[in-house]
Amino acid sequence: MNGSRIAAVGHYQPAKVLTNEDLASLVDTSDEWIRSRVGIRTRHFAGPDEPVDELAGHAAAKALASAGLAPADIDLVLVATSTAEDRSPNMAARVAARLGIPSPAAMDINVVCAGFTHALATADHAVRAGAATRALVIGADKMSAVTDWSDRTTCVLVGDGAGAAVVDACPEGAEPGIGPVLWGSVPEMGHAVRIEGTPPRFAQEGQSVYRWATTQLPAIARRACERAGLTPADLAGVVLHQANLRIIEPLAAKIGAVNAVVARDVVESGNTSAASIPLAFSKLVERGEISTGDPVLLFGFGGNLSYAGQVIRCP
């Protein structure tokens, strides 16, 4: 087997949009305060009648349509999320039922903001090993449901949404479309990003996360490029976890992808956790900012102080 590839992508965001001015009516904040600290202008929020699997299902349906596939063509469903409403049935099974996928392996992966790139690597390994033929990989989170709306340092960050990718085998003779993953974590610092308590609430130690992301992750991201046989200058695109602009911009600069389009979807969508990478990537594809075959670094990081990155070829 030559390897696997991303055959198609899709994304979905709820219709409700909150501006910084809207948030200023809820907590002690302002448009200037938010934009100067995290670079976010707007975010999308799901309603109480829009569960996570509905967001995921919409994105997945778009990816399937783009790939020209029927639900029955999928035999593996992976959903990266940390905001599932229930422990069982899991989100992957719920999405499969929603879409009419008849008998897939269905698994959730909870690595918070790095979940999608972990799930993508898992799908790549499954397809290359022959354990799956076509995988549906989804990142979906409803961060508004786990937000403390009295904490202005976190409630201004979050948004809801989903992104999805179809992963299948590369055509005969083609180069692998998903490069080797570089992943890991810093367990002793896992408390720096948390969703805990009853009901669960998102909290983080912002300065610790910022220092880790901007000092430790650039070298790791460059190593992910090396594993794909590339340098950062070879990249056409960089899609980092959309944490906030104060992290994205220095991290991208230190990686050294001088010729790449850098996704900044956080400005319009906020931090959507596991959804942020597939959501931003799908938008770059949709807008034509990256082209078929272009090398793109996907690099997730966050909760558990986990990270996972790989270079993929644009579908």
UniProtKB/Swiss-Prot annotation:
Its EC number is 2.3.1.180. It comes from the Bacteria. It is an enzyme of class 2 (transferase). The keyword Thylakoid does not apply. Residues 242-246 are annotated as: ACP-binding. The active site is at residues 113, 241, 271. It is found in: Cytoplasm. Pathway: Lipid metabolism; fatty acid biosynthesis. Keywords: Acyltransferase, Cytoplasm, Fatty acid biosynthesis, Fatty acid metabolism, Lipid biosynthesis, Lipid metabolism, Multifunctional enzyme, Transferase. Its main location: cytoplasm. It catalyses: malonyl-[ACP] + acetyl-CoA + H(+) = 3-oxobutanoyl-[ACP] + CO2 + CoA. The keyword Iron-sulfur does not apply. One of its GO terms (cellular component) is cytoplasm. Homodimer. The last Arg residue of the ACP-binding site is essential for the weak association between ACP/AcpP and FabH. Belongs to the thiolase-like superfamily. FabH family. This is Beta-ketoacyl-[acyl-carrier-protein] synthase III 2. It comes from Streptomyces avermitilis (strain ATCC 31267 / DSM 46492 / JCM 5070 / NBRC 14893 / NCIMB 12804 / NRRL 8165 / MA-4680).
